[in-house]
């Protein structure tokens, strides 16, 4: 089974609030370890993407730090709810990625 057919699948990396490809446009295959079949790809990120991710996190941190515990808990709860709403598809993706039937 190919994970590319799942709505949650992205072949990009999430940096600074955006889904982006690696500057090199290179990718790394994600293979089912049981069958060795390619089930997807991920960007082959390098120094540029790592630097951008670090700089973006450093820029975002003061705003996050200034939020109250209640505000942060609301954001984390929304993330938790999204995971729960999509738990079936996430479980299927993880199962395929681990080579299980």
Which positions does each model-derived feature cover?
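Terminal low-complexity tails and localization/encapsulation signals of metabolic enzymes
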Residues: 1-41, 74, 78
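Glycine-rich loop-to-alpha-helix module at the N-terminal edge of alpha/beta enzyme cores
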Residues: 37-101
């Amino acid at each position: 089974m190919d994970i590319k057919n799942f709505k949650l699948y992205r072949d990009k990396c999430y940096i600074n609030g955006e889904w982006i490809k690696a500057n090199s446009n290179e990718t790394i295959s994600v293979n089912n370890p049981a069958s060795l079949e390619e089930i997807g790809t991920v960007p082959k990120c390098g120094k540029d993407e790592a630097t951008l991710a670090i700089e973006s996190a450093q820029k975002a941190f003061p705003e996050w730090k200034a939020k109250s515990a209640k505000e942060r808990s609301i954001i984390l709860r929304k993330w938790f709810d999204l995971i729960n709403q999509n738990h079936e598809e996430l479980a299927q993706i993880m199962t395929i990625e681990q080579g299980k039937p």
